[in-house]
């Protein structure tokens, strides 16, 4: 632990952040493979690829809710663990990790029961047609039964990164993704299981990742260990974790509501082909958002530790570096989406009608994504500094206050309602990024002057 303190508190800020960011970004990119490799293979199944891809895409709102509950714990607990470690309170840090593990197990039991029973009704609500519902159900029911592994991987892995073991955290995702990539073609095509094979491959790979995490957090190499005597939930531990994680939870759960809004509106105005295009666009957009989250995930321990230690200049340097990386990446990604949307769409499907539809709609949807890096960098920095309330408000701004209403309003104001649905995204991206960035810079110095509260 002393070595971790010395590195976080006195080493080169940029070097430290890169050491943590690179594995975190790699882990997020590899994690992206969990989400898109299935879709790439499914989209190329002969004869049913487009319908099967659309059906699996309709499972996205449930998938996002599962991820949201995992990150309610992981994104809330990891910064508090780092702050406690920076304050020299190892006992409290281990209580946070152990309580968080218990909460993830409880969430997984409840969510499995609720989503498995409600899947048929929910998928219809999301816009499933008679042609796409069988594929949506086949995939979702298997995935839901393995949701405990999903929650453990997503919820506990941040506790490895926040201790400075970024490479170990990266390996968690890499191992699972490699297994998924190997199993997908075997189960989907070799054994002829189709979408069921894709779901089985994902669940098995997540199970291996969960075992890897638990072995590390109970082993000798970790600084902070999972402890049986600390697993009984304590209100004074859990509530602060939930309070800080709620902003990420809102961001991810509103992604679910957002996905429902897009799918239902596009099903109404454009039919299955529009919903299928949205599935491809959503997958492509993760190529932007997940690496940014990896950058912020790598920057969080450095910011949180030095904030807890009262080293303001290092916190400022860490934020500037994080903002620069996020902003540059999203601008480059925007350029790619404007120049070659058809090539990106072709990765996910061989259906020419779906590729053509996706090409023009992707340009509209991605028109404001260059601003996303600034919004996420500032919003995640609020979290790293323990500012739960303002982080939550900013998480609500883009999706709840701006985007979801625009999805339903713009189709009535424009001659082409489908164009209006897709246009809602860039309008809200640019407005939200502007407001979030201004808010952060107006509060940043004041937060640093007040310092971190005792965890």
Give the residues covered by each predicted segment.
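Helix-terminus/linker motif at the lipid-water interface of multi-pass membrane proteins
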Residues: 29, 33-54, 123-130, 186-193, ...
């Amino acid at each position: 632990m002393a070595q971790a303190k010395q590195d976080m508190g006195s080493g080169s800020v940029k070097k430290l952040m890169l050491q943590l960011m690179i594995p975190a970004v790699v882990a997020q990119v590899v994690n992206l493979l969990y989400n898109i490799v299935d879709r790439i293979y499914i989209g190329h199944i002969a004869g049913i690829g487009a319908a099967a891809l659309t059906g699996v895409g309709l499972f996205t709102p449930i998938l996002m809710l599962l991820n949201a509950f995992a990150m309610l714990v992981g994104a809330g607990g990891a910064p508090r663990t780092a702050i406690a470690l920076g304050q020299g309170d190892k006992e409290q840090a281990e209580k946070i990790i152990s309580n968080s593990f218990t909460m993830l197990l409880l969430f997984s039991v409840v969510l499995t029961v609720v989503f498995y029973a409600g899947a048929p009704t929910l998928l219809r609500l999301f816009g499933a047609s008679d042609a796409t519902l069988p594929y949506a159900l086949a995939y979702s029911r298997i995935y839901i039964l393995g949701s405990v592994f999903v929650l453990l991987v997503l919820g506990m892995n941040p506790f490895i990164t926040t201790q400075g073991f970024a490479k170990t955290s990266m390996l968690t995702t890499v191992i699972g993704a490699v297994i998924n990539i190997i199993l997908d073609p075997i189960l989907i095509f070799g054994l002829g299981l189709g979408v069921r094979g894709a779901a089985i491959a994902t669940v098995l790979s997540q199970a291996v990742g969960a075992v890897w995490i638990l072995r590390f957090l109970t082993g000798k190499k970790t600084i902070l260990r999972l402890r049986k005597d600390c697993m009984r939930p304590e209100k004074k531990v859990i509530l602060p974790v939930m309070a800080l994680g709620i902003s990420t939870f809102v961001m991810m759960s509103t992604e679910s509501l957002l996905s429902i809004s897009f799918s239902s509106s596009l099903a109404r105005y454009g039919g299955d082909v529009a919903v299928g295009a949205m599935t491809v666009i959503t997958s492509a957009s993760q190529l932007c958002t997940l690496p940014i989250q990896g950058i912020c995930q790598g920057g969080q321990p450095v910011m949180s530790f030095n904030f807890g230690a009262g080293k303001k200049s290092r916190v400022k340097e860490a934020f500037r570096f994080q903002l620069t990386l996020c902003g540059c990446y999203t601008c480059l990604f925007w350029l790619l989406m404007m120049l070659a949307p058809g090539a990106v769409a072709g990765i996910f499907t061989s259906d020419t009608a779906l590729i053509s539809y996706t090409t023009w709609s992707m340009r509209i949807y991605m028109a404001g994504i260059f601003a996303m890096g600034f919004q996420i960098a500032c919003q995640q920095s609020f979290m790293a500094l323990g500012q739960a309330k303002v982080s939550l408000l900013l998480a609500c701004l883009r999706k709840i206050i701006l985007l979801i209403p625009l999805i339903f309003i713009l189709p009535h104001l424009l001659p082409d309602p489908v164009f209006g649905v897709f246009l809602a995204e860039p309008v809200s991206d640019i407005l939200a990024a502007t407001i979030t960035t201004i808010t952060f810079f107006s509060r940043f110095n004041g937060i640093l002057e007040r310092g971190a509260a005792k965890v």
